[in-house]
Curated annotation (Swiss-Prot):
Short name of any one Pfam family annotated for the protein: DHHA1
UniProt organism field: Pyrococcus horikoshii (strain ATCC 700860 / DSM 12428 / JCM 9974 / NBRC 100139 / OT-3)
Subunit composition and interactions: Homodimer.
EC number per UniProt: 6.1.1.7
UniProt name for this protein: Alanine--tRNA ligase
Alphabetical keyword list: Aminoacyl-tRNA synthetase, ATP-binding, Cytoplasm, Ligase, Metal-binding, Nucleotide-binding, Protein biosynthesis, RNA-binding, tRNA-binding, Zinc
Length: 915
């Protein structure tokens, strides 16, 4: 679809619409002689060495200039909004915030929640991995950048501003505030689509650099049954009009600072506090500035994902500056590595400060990718500097603007240090892994490691393709690393899977029903109630009101009975479909629409769920205070006997930490703090309590239920809770588990369940005391004494076993039979698999075959290097005769037979092979 993008300013101020002679796209300009749109590769950078803004700005100065301009605008004052975390806790469809508009998707865009201000202005740190392979090379690409933006949400009947005003505001900011030359600014028409939305858009270009994008979001993805007269096609996808029309702008903070300084790259302009120290550490010689400038000018027109080959760029730059490609590579490569390290470590600082824990999954995977890529770059530079030292430079520089960096500094640096140690261990183990894979490829006659194998090495074992290449080339095997390797694996990691639950009842059969009145919220202590039957569908009964809690948020459903005409019918499951609650019953035939039934909750089950749910919130507060603010809930589940809480944490929780957590949680219980809950508009709740609200994951709806423990914990939660912490009863941590990389599981019990666990422990202590005939307080020293005595006895047993083995070897040697040039030993003996394996190892000689079978059916075989068969072939023959299974290497094999009565037949059969 082609949009007509004529604005008031273009018409009134003499702007001309032209078609770019290079790319053919339409653009608007004040310059009648202009023939190109201003966008690379149609135009080169024209500001390097000649800044396009009269005065130099720092990041802080440019950010404040932008925010203040929109905040204080006379006609359109905007509400200033603080940055959102780069880890978007309010949504589950993306891993990281990649643009300012993502702060307001889906709730504000859909109209389910009000924006924090309308219109608003924000400077949002954004992280994108799509360009990771361009970072350091093009001079303009970053994984971390700040998207300065002004947004307006035009709800039906409540317009704010649209295309005319947006273009005028942008032009006013650039020309009046930053003093850019109007005739050098172009507005290029380029429809935008992303995140399920689309609309017409302008790219604002100035002297070869895109400095802003102005999107007019007015379409959403079309459903399959959308009316055809409403459907428009944008970039090959079908869309329909949105009710809310959104002004979605993005101004590149780093690019504007770069424009004001005219440095060879944007990295020099905004990351100098890391770039310069790294240059000194690496001892990099200063190169001719002309090389850097020409490299940047051409690199600005280059995209690895498009051209795919860095060599092409090198050739063009080398030709322009009059040196060889090799000379250029030698001069420019260290700079590119340093720029990439500076960018990646800044992205890491934001990610870790906002709660990302490095791991093998989701955002943690992307953090680990940055860490390992940065370490690899440092290694290529020959630098031994710890990565944590570089991250510390970012914290030192940025903490005044982002005070949370200083608060999290110790944890951020410890996470990085631990990751560096893990990577060193990965490399140590990984070398053998790569060599084994190379051996397999060589056997098949393959002389190059395929790309999919490089991806497996990276994703499953943490081995970067550069490391694999280094090892492979020593073994004579080729490795071609795709130029876009890292953006390729990051793209795969960023895909989020949509989980669809089982459909219990067809929603179409429920959509005409009113929302179920939730009595469990009105009175969480309601044990009995009366309600009217609205519908019966298969085994499910729908009531107009219920005190039965439906499964959700980690809390199991309630059970109990519905009493019909004096008869109790069991309720075995309760679920929520939309805003309707459905009850599974044992005898659905007993229910008729319109009848009144009496419900009774299994109170013993419910109250224990309430104890465990409130206890989960108490424990979460203790975990954050003891372990740090990086701790976030990664899942939870309640039962009547125990509860579990999964948290993000970068190492195992120590015993001392567990004691402190448990003590702190129980102190809050004993203080009997108030637990309150209220329904708040989503935006109000976020502004009041921050994004730590979303501990339990994304909570849908315009209004969210906020559960608050007095001065301790606040979460958006739909569960049933106790009115004070004292009712939780004692909290006992039973154990912790490492369920996956970066996630700790705490299993605990509250109230009666905790008391039962203490009673179990007391019974075990009593039993152990009775066995050892000592009082419980003497158990540790008695157990230690017994253990030491057992160790001494074990040493004696081992000595005797070694002596017996020596005698057995001597005896077996004496039974050796000569068959031609081969020595053969075959016997049935006593011993474990381990014993047999040790014996055949000791008896092994170049021209000898040894077959030993134990009376328990274990067997071991050894074959000398000068014997013409392999041990694993003999193992197959043994199991063919006596059943069972086994296998091994060329020289040693082992296994177990099913039929021990055939042991002698086996030995004779093997012996006959050499007769």
């Amino acid at each position: 679809m082609e949009f007509i993008m004529k604005t008031r300013m273009f018409e009134e101020e003499g702007w001309i619409r032209k078609k770019c002679k290079v790319c053919g796209k339409p653009f608007w300009t004040l310059d009648p002689d202009r023939e190109t749109c201003g966008d690379p590769p149609c135009d080169e950078y024209q500001f390097i060495g000649k800044p396009g803004i009269p005065r130099k700005y720092t990041l802080d100065e440019m950010r404040e200039k932008f925010l203040r301009f929109f905040e204080k605008h006379e006609i359109y004052p905007h509400g200033r909004v603080k940055r959102y975390p780069v880890l978007p806790r309010w949504r589950d469809d993306v891993l990281l915030v990649g643009a300012s508009i993502m702060d307001f998707q889906p709730w504000v865009i859909s109209g389910e929640a009000d924006p924090p201000a309308n219109p608003l202005v924000i400077s949002q740190p954004s992280i994108r991995f799509t360009d990771i392979d361009n970072v350091g090379i093009t001079g303009r690409h970053f994984t971390i950048f700040e998207m300065m933006a002004h947004h307006a949400f035009n709800y039906p009947g409540k317009p704010i501003y649209w295309m005319d005003e947006t273009v005028e505001l942008a032009f006013e900011f650039f020309t009046k505030e930053l003093k850019m030359k109007p005739e050098d600014i172009t507005f290029k028409e380029n429809p935008w689509a992303g995140g399920g939305n689309a609309g017409p858009a302008f790219e604002v270009l100035y002297r070869g650099l895109e400095v802003a994008t102005l999107v007019f979001m007015q379409y959403k993805k079309a459903p399959e049954n959308a009316p055809q007269d409403q459907v428009v096609v944008i970039k090959g996808e079908k869309y329909i009009p949105m009710e809310t029309k959104v002004v979605d702008t993005g101004y590149g903070l780093e690019r504007l600072v770069w424009m004001s300084q005219g440095t060879p790259t944007a990295y020099d302009a905004v990351l100098g506090y890391v770039v310069e120290p790294l240059k000194k550490m690496a001892g990099i010689e200063k190169i001719d500035e002309k090389i850097l400038m020409e490299n940047s000018r051409l690199a600005g027109m280059f995209d690895i994902e498009d051209l795919g080959d860095l060599r092409y760029l090198r050739e063009q730059v080398a030709k322009r500056v009059g040196i060889t490609v090799e000379e250029l590579e030698k001069a420019i490569r260290p700079y590119e590595l340093i720029y990439a390290i500076a960018d990646h470590t800044k992205a890491l600082t934001f990610m870790l400060a906002d709660g990302v824990v490095p791991s093998n999954v989701k955002a943690g995977y992307l953090a680990r990718l940055l860490i390992r890529k940065s370490i690899r770059h440092l290694r290529e530079l020959g630098l031994e500097v710890p990565l944590s030292e570089i991250v510390a430079l970012h914290i030192k520089e940025l903490h005044k603007t982002f005070p949370e960096f200083k608060e999290m500094e110790d944890i951020i640096l410890e996470m990085i240090e631990l990751e560096e140690k893990k990577y060193a261990e990965t490399l140590r183990r990984g070398s053998d892994l790569v060599r084994r894979e190379i051996a397999k490829l060589k056997k098949k006659g393959i002389k190059e490691i395929p790309v999919e194998k490089l991806v497996t090495f990276y994703e499953s074992h943490g081995l970067t393709p550069e490391i694999v290449k280094e090892i492979a080339e020593k073994e004579g095997v080729k490795v071609n690393i795709p130029d876009n390797f890292y953006s390729m694996v990051a793209k795969e990691a960023e895909r989020t899977k949509e989980e669809k639950g089982e459909e219990l009842v067809d929603f179409e059969l429920l959509k005409d029903l009113p929302d179920t009145r939730r009595l469990y919220y009105e009175d969480p202590f309601m044990k009995e109630f009366d309600a009217k039957v609205l519908r019966v569908i298969k085994d499910w009964v729908i009531l107009d009101a219920t005190a039965f809690y439906p499964e959700g948020g980690g809390q199991p459903y309630d059970t109990g009975v519905l009493i019909v005409n004096g008869r109790e019918v069991k309720v075995t499951n309760v679920q929520k479909v939309g805003k309707v609650i459905i009850h599974k019953v044992e005898d659905p035939g007993a229910f008729k629409e319109g009848m009144i039934v009496h419900g009774k909750i299994d109170w013993k089950r419910r109250i224990q769920h309430m104890r465990h749910h409130t206890g989960t919130h108490v424990l979460m507060g203790a975990l954050v205070r003891v372990l740090g603010r990086h701790v976030w809930q990664a899942g939870s589940q309640l039962t009547t006997d125990w509860a579990r809480l999964d948290i993000s944490h970068y190492k195992r929780i120590s015993e001392e930490e567990l004691k402190e957590i448990e003590m702190l949680a129980n102190r809050i219980v004993m203080e009997d703090r108030k637990v309150t809950w209220e329904w708040l508009p989503r935006t109000t709740a976020e502004q009041k309590y921050g994004f730590r609200l979303y501990q339990g994951g994304v909570v849908p709806g315009r209004e969210i239920r906020v559960v608050k423990i007095e001065d301790w914990d606040v979460q958006a939660c739909g569960g049933t809770h106790l009115p004070s912490t004292g009712l939780v009863g004692p909290i006992k941590i039973l154990r912790t588990e490492r369920i996956q990389d970066g996630v700790e599981r705490i299993i605990f019990a509250c109230g009666e369940a905790a008391i039962r666990e203490w009673q179990k422990e007391r019974d075990l202590l009593k039993k152990a005391s009775n066995v050892l005939r000592v009082p419980p307080e003497k158990l540790p020293e008695t157990a230690e004494r017994f253990f030491n005595e057992w160790k001494e006895a074990r040493k004696e047993v081992d000595k005797l076993k070694k002596e017996l083995a020596r005698l057995l070897v001597y005896e077996l040697e004496s039974k050796m039979q000569k068959i031609g040039s081969i020595e053969f030993i075959g016997e049935v003996v006593e011993g474990s698999m381990e014993d047999l394996r040790e014996l055949v190892e000791k008896l092994k000689k170049p021209k000898r075959v040894v077959v030993l079978i134990s009376r328990d059916g274990y067997f071991a075989v050894s074959v000398g290097s000068e014997v013409g068969v392999e041990a694993n072939e003999l193992a197959k023959k043994i199991t063919l005769i006596a059943g069972g299974g086994g296998g091994g290497r060329r020289d040693i094999a082992q296994g177990k037979v099913k039929d021990i009565s055939k042991a002698k037949d086996v030995i004779e059969s093997i012996k006959s092979m050499f007769s």
